[in-house]
Amino acid sequence: LLGWQCAAAHAFPAAAGLSACRLKGVEHGALCGSVRRALDPAQPSGTQIDVHYAVLPAVARNKHPDPVFFFAGGPGQSAMALAGPISGLLARFGNRRDLVLVDQRGTGRSAPLHCAVDDETRLPLAEQFDAQRQLARLADCRIVLQKLPYGDLRRFTTPLAVQDVDAVRAALGASRINLVGASYGTRAALEYQRQFPQH
């Protein structure tokens, strides 16, 4: 298995900076990496974030050069956390194409946006779903998130997230890619196609 992982790593440019990793529910080894991105593309020397991704290498010897990129749902789901179920669902593609899972900015390991909120599951349902209570929680959450080093929430958008995905594509040296999305991920995939029709 180690030899297989090393051989798979050599199929990608050294600039991709991939290393062997384990993902829950994935039988074969995976390769993980990250690309450094400006939080605000208009300020390339400003705050930087790392966009993390995983590659599940194709198992066939004669693989196709165009990987499959999976866009998770939500928005807010970690694509890497879904590696096990997604690799099973996309096994037909994964036999001959690498499968790439990108934790988009704000999700998973890529500048995550998580609020530590009180556990309200013990409250009566009417109180849990009270509109005013929810609005207050959202306002509190926004304040918490804005204090993060990467807390400019205006920079966590679908158009910027797909630009990050294209940076992953470039790091992997893929000239053409295939897109698969689930739920919100279909919208992100369409935005990618709109911005980068050449790939």
Question: Where are the regions that the model predicts?
Answer:
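Bacterial N-terminal signal peptides
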Residues: L1-Q5
